[in-house]
């Protein structure tokens, strides 16, 4: 009765802990996205659990006979708009596109990943280190959680913290990053990072 003393974890762990194919896949993701060397698997399981919740909600709505009006229509629109704000879908996506989101799309929306994609850090590992040590801010809010899911409108105010040594544009690190950024220019728009292929042409790392 009443509220539980401790909140239950929403993260679902693998049903079979020793499947080699899954272990190899998760090790590859851990290296690609610069996750914790010890405990990085839990970060992947957390994203998979969140993805599973999005898919279950979408499948429930797709299975309805009529979602063109009423409560289910609003629920469908709310889900799509929510995922658009999170950068997992682009504007104009449909409820079917939710099923094409995968765990890499989820991992790419972590603050750590976006810091790297935005050219604020030379690697995923470096991005994690900079966030943990307080060198990254969203607006005036200093961020220290690499796994924070950044929203699309927050990307424009993502920057170095005001009290960080890297906030100085003449800092040697900033000079080197600018040179590196110029050599890594591509034709893809950075705001399309993390969007499902059904809604955009390419998935950019």
Regions found by a protein language model. Name each.
Residues 1-118, 137, 141-205:
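Ferredoxin-like alpha/beta domains used as RNA- or RNAP-binding modules
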Residues 121-125, 133:
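Beta-rich strand-turn-strand
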